[in-house]
Amino acid sequence: MNLEELVLKYALANAVKYGGKADVKAVMSKIMAEVPELRPKAREVKSMVEAVVARVNSMSLEEQLRLLRERWPETLEERRVEQKRPGIENLAELPNVKGGVVVRFAPNPDFVLHLGSARPAILNYAYRLKYGGKFILRFEDTDPRTKKPLVTSEINAYETIREDLKWLGIKWDEEYIQSMRMEIYYEHIKKLLEKGAAYVDLCRPEEWRKLRNAGRACPHREQSPEENLELWDRMLEGRFKEGEAVVRIKTDLSHPDPSVRDWVAFRIIDTSKTPHPLVGDKYIVWPTYNFAVSIDDHLMGITHVLRAQEHSVNTIKQSYIFKHFGWEQPVTIHFGRLKIEGASLSKSKLKALGVRYDDISLPTLAGLRNRGILPEAIWELILTVGVKPSDSTIALSNLFALNRKRIEPIANRYMYVADPIKLVFKSDRELLAKIPLHPSFRERGERIYKFGPGTIELFVPRQDIKPGAVVRLMELANVEIIAVENGVAHGRLHSVGIDEARKVGAPIIQWVYEPIEIHVVKPVAVGKKVEEIGLGESALEKVETGAYVQFMRYGFLKKVGPSAFVYVHD
């Protein structure tokens, strides 16, 4: 392959990846990485790259794709072998699979991903792993007014979504951002206007609703292509204000669902007032969800669409675009909503809570990650629910159970007292406690405590201390509580063995000796958490940040800093 062909290959690949426009710097980087000996001739190479990129950018996206498929199909094919995940083999078979699938996950970056949005991401990627093919990440961000992409000094939803997907172990083959593809949408609506499959509607919204509900045509429906193209140009020039003109797709005016009748494909959004975070006020005429999705699904070669049941009407609307262009529509599988018992997955409600998107009390993926939920647990949950047309309601306890079985073997045991009281008692003998780091993995070691004979001072849970009662100090001894005076509990050694404790029904309680102060942050409800300060074993100082532990008789936690822990679940 000569140099010009190599440049053409990378220019086409870059253009297809980014909506039809190649970038000189990106192509140069690819060339220099593959042929480093060309670096001394970078100036001459750049001139060639600029010329080829200009030629490629003058082509339509369809032409770019055709050339790439004809000459370098390997750039569009599966490029890596990935490990199958447990549970994928149990997924229901997809219809009409021909040697692989091309699927997409298409989030709106107006908020971060949560447990509900993890479902389409995981299911689509799981089928990509099951059959081979391609997984596309597509940001659907063409509504800068009502669903404005979330980009602030604190959060960039585009980046956060990418991070969440990487955390889930999802690797996308291609990425697209719809707001960067506006010229492509303009090109295609112009074709529909030319062939009389769409028209510019100047009716007032209330007038249109009356006509639509009556199944009658708008007076602008019969405009000639020339008239529509002129009105379209006026829309692009800013000659109309918001709400004064829209472009409609011709459908069936007698369709039983009024929303399907001549739905809006383009509308005017005054981006001088609500600028888009990526393209600012460059565009004022924006495609609706259904139009942009239809064009992209075709151009990106999507074979199967897996999405929520709530999109079933959108599938019908999009079918008209495919019919007008004579394209084959992807196979669409709808699944029910995923509901979390006692927790809302509504973006608006989560935003309204007023806490950071990655707060451990939220069911966002960032929040669950910070809380200590493992991505493998989320995968198992989603694959277990699978692709069902009916809604599924699960409790967070289901997710916690799946997470627990993964962290239980790696979480060493430690003692912690949330609301401590000092316990003082005397022993006439030496007491010995051997506490293993993990009862199932004795080889990890143990802590050995020796006390007495004499006065012994420990800290125990206040709620377990009642005068006259006997308590079993875990792995140590049985103590009878005599009195509580001035905030200190006093007792006497009752016995040592576990059998004696059972005979008197003594509860087993944790205790700490020469403790350190421990800070625990605990989620108590969606958007709410509490912080408690307790006492823990000094051995907790040696636990690495990020490690999981189990506080006995308390729950599983994740260390997030010196003496700081996050409560994961019980």
Curated annotation (Swiss-Prot):
Gene3D superfamilies: 2.40.240.100, HUPs, Ribosomal Protein L25, Chain P
Primary subcellular site in the record, as a coarse category: cytoplasm
GO molecular function: ATP binding; glutamate-tRNA ligase activity
GO cellular component, one term: cytosol
Subcellular location: Cytoplasm
GO terms classed as biological process: amide biosynthetic process; glutamyl-tRNA aminoacylation
The enzyme's E.C. designation: 6.1.1.17
Catalytic activity: tRNA(Glu) + L-glutamate + ATP = L-glutamyl-tRNA(Glu) + AMP + diphosphate
Domain of life: Archaea
One Pfam family hit: tRNA-synt_1c
Placement of sequence motif 'HIGH' region: 107-117
Keyword annotations: Aminoacyl-tRNA synthetase, ATP-binding, Cytoplasm, Ligase, Nucleotide-binding, Protein biosynthesis
Record function comment: Catalyzes the attachment of glutamate to tRNA(Glu) in a two-step reaction: glutamate is first activated by ATP to form Glu-AMP and then transferred to the acceptor end of tRNA(Glu).
NCBIfam families the UniProt entry points to: gltX_arch (TIGR00463), PRK04156.1 (NF003169)
Family per record: Belongs to the class-I aminoacyl-tRNA synthetase family. Glutamate--tRNA ligase type 2 subfamily.
Name assigned to this protein: Glutamate--tRNA ligase
Source organism (scientific name): Pyrobaculum islandicum (strain DSM 4184 / JCM 9189 / GEO3)
Gene: gltX
